[in-house]
Amino acid sequence: MDMSGYRRPGRRLRSTRRLLGILAFALVVVGVGASSAAATKHAGGPATCSGTPGSPGVLSGTYSSNVTIEGVCAAVAGAAVIEGNLTLTPGSGLNAAFAAGSVTVQGNLSVGRGAFMYLGCIPRSFACFDDPNHEHPTLSSASTVEGNLSETQPLGVVVHNSTIGGNVQQTGGGGGTTCENPPPTFPFGVFSDYEDSRIGGSINVIGLNSCWLGLARDSVGRNVHILQDQLADPDAIEIIANQIGNNLVCQQNSMVWNSVETQEGANFPRVPLPNEARHRVGQCVLASPLSEGGPLGPGPF
């Protein structure tokens, strides 16, 4: 999967708006999708979507039971409705960030060890892979998981413009605390990201070791727990402008920020984008520094 034209939304969170030039993978799956865009009702019983980076499987139509992804698949041919659970097996991948497709999971979505997933896209923060102009994107795609999104030792999970009815639980994974020697699926460093989405329950990211992590402009019904996460990018972990129903808890992490930088290529100066939460605990009590060497606060994180 060649993603060399894409820009990582790590060191500069706002650069996701100018994200991702057209890449070979996108061209392949768009071509596949064009020939299979008609809505399909799949036969009853569990189903499997399988493919390779060079020839991805296409997730499309209505599945009346559970679906398992093996290898690489893409949602690029209209709506994919899964009336059961969706499972990404270890080392597999799902790209559901195309305007030409969407995913609705009526059960739970599980991401296995070493797997990756892109879910949803929106001009504000993450251009769709098939948007013809990534400098000024206009296309979008929204996906829904009615149950929980559970990730166990994933490589990276990137969620935008999506609704998760239950909880988001990311435990471990990330490919190591480094931005060096990234895999083709994350050419500028492995990252996980949750932006411009609605989560009915809580978000818990625990024990992640990666290049970058972000949570931005999410509506979270209950709690956010960011615990024991170590990120290599000095601009991580960014937690900005979220609406959190209960607690925001950050403990034993590398640096956390509730602000964004004002100059490309420099971490300072920064502009605060505080979160709304009933209670703040640990590293997310006082606002992060706005100048190099500056103090925390005085405002809330």
Annotate the PLM regions.
Residues 40-93, 295, 299-301:
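N-terminal segments that cap or nucleate solenoid repeat domains
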Residues 34-36:
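N-terminal signal peptide c-region/cleavage motif recognized by signal peptidases
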Residues 1-16:
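N-terminal secretory signal peptides that target proteins for export/translocation
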Residues 236-301:
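Leucine-rich solenoid repeat scaffolds
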Residues 93-94, 111-144, 167-194, 210-215, ...:
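Acidic/polar low-complexity surface segments
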Residues 21-32:
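Bacterial N-terminal signal peptides
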Residues 70, 77, 83, 89, ...:
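Feature marks extracellular polysaccharide-active and adherence modules
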Residues 46-51, 71, 119, 126, ...:
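Extracellular secreted precursors and ectodomains with disulfide-bonded cysteine-rich loops/domains
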